[in-house]
């Protein structure tokens, strides 16, 4: 996939850890439903399993010509030739990741605008703020004040995503903040119909959030 000119925006699916038989089916159905980007996130499996799963998820993403990211593991992203990697403050330092990885880099900025400014200056291609709601994916995570998003593009030019507990019921909360996309986990992975869930989220995102940017 050629990355030049690719706008990082839209509906961003972050996976659960690989554990269930229908893991790959969920991802493919979600893509059919409208997911624009997939990030493989797995905190529990050994590296050998993660390598195999990453390759399979990448094949699915390539089939539909959508961006494929790896969470945290820059070396794994290099090995499977992922389009991008997403890191945070507890992972490889951003300047180091930028030196060794030629693809796209996303950076978690939590509720910290200064961290977003740092990320842009050090080569990040997008930032992710949140969570702004309680989330089952990270039960102990702090919940941040949504007002950190106000006028965010006065401070940075790279795309801004939001993540954490976002679902069809609260996605409109982000209308008017100028964000570029939302990232979800449970809103798709916990839904019995991932394709429908993705389609509804995509419609709400484009009709009420991105249209108000």
Curated annotation (Swiss-Prot):
Chain positions recorded as 2-[(2R,5Z)-2-carboxy-4-methylthiazol-5(2H)-ylidene]ethyl phosphate binding sites: 135-137, 165, 185-186
Keyword Magnesium annotated: yes
Functional pathway: Cofactor biosynthesis; thiamine diphosphate biosynthesis; thiamine phosphate from 4-amino-2-methyl-5-diphosphomethylpyrimidine and 4-methyl-5-(2-phosphoethyl)-thiazole: step 1/1
GO molecular function: magnesium ion binding; thiamine-phosphate diphosphorylase activity
Cofactor detail note: Binds 1 Mg(2+) ion per subunit.
CDD domains linked: TMP_TenI (cd00564)
Keywords: Magnesium, Metal-binding, Thiamine biosynthesis, Transferase
Magnesium in keyword set: yes
Catalytic reactions on record: 2-[(2R,5Z)-2-carboxy-4-methylthiazol-5(2H)-ylidene]ethyl phosphate + 4-amino-2-methyl-5-(diphosphooxymethyl)pyrimidine + 2 H(+) = thiamine phosphate + CO2 + diphosphate; 2-(2-carboxy-4-methylthiazol-5-yl)ethyl phosphate + 4-amino-2-methyl-5-(diphosphooxymethyl)pyrimidine + 2 H(+) = thiamine phosphate + CO2 + diphosphate; 4-methyl-5-(2-phosphooxyethyl)-thiazole + 4-amino-2-methyl-5-(diphosphooxymethyl)pyrimidine + H(+) = thiamine phosphate + diphosphate
GO CC terms of this entry: cytoplasm
Binding positions (Mg(2+)): 72, 91
Enzyme Commission no: 2.5.1.3
Cofactors, names only: Mg(2+)
Domain of life: Archaea
One Pfam entry name: TMP-TENI
UniProt record, GO biological process: thiamine biosynthetic process; thiamine diphosphate biosynthetic process
InterPro entries: Aldolase_TIM, ThiamineP_synth_sf, ThiamineP_synth_TenI, TMP_synthase
Annotated binding of 4-amino-2-methyl-5-(diphosphooxymethyl)pyrimidine, by residue: 39-43, 71, 108, 138
Disulfide bridge map: none
Uppermost EC category: transferase
PANTHER family according to UniProt: THIAMINE BIOSYNTHETIC BIFUNCTIONAL ENZYME, THIAMINE-PHOSPHATE PYROPHOSPHORYLASE
Similarity comment text for this entry: Belongs to the thiamine-phosphate synthase family.
Task of the protein: Condenses 4-methyl-5-(beta-hydroxyethyl)thiazole monophosphate (THZ-P) and 2-methyl-4-amino-5-hydroxymethyl pyrimidine pyrophosphate (HMP-PP) to form thiamine monophosphate (TMP).
Protein name per UniProt: Thiamine-phosphate synthase
Source species of the chain: Thermoplasma acidophilum (strain ATCC 25905 / DSM 1728 / JCM 9062 / NBRC 15155 / AMRC-C165)
Taxonomy of the source species: Archaea, Methanobacteriati, Thermoplasmatota, Thermoplasmata, Thermoplasmatales
């Amino acid at each position: 996939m050629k990355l030049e000119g690719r706008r990082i925006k839209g509906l961003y699916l972050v996976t659960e850890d690989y554990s269930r038989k229908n893991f790959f089916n969920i991802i493919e159905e979600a893509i059919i439903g409208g997911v624009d980007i997939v990030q493989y996130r797995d905190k529990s499996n050994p590296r050998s399993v993660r390598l195999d799963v990453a390759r399979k998820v990448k094949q699915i993403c390539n089939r539909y010509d959508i961006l494929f990211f790896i969470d945290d593991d820059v070396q794994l992203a290099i090995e499977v030739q992922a389009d991008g990697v997403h890191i945070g403050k507890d992972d490889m330092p951003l300047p180091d990741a930028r030196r060794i990885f030629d693809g796209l880099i996303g950076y978690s900025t939590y509720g910290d605008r200064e961290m977003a400014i740092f990320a842009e200056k050090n080569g990040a291609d997008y930032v992710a703020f949140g969570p702004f709601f309680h989330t089952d994916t990270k039960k102990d995570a702090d919940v941040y004040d949504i007002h950190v998003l106000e006028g965010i593009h006065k401070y940075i030019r790279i795309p801004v995503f939001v993540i954490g507990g976002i679902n069809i019921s609260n996605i409109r909360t982000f209308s008017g903040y100028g964000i570029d996309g939302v990232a979800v986990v449970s809103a798709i992975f916990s839904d019995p119909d991932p394709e429908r869930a993705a389609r509804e989220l995509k419609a709400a995102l484009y009709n009420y959030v991105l249209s108000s940017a």
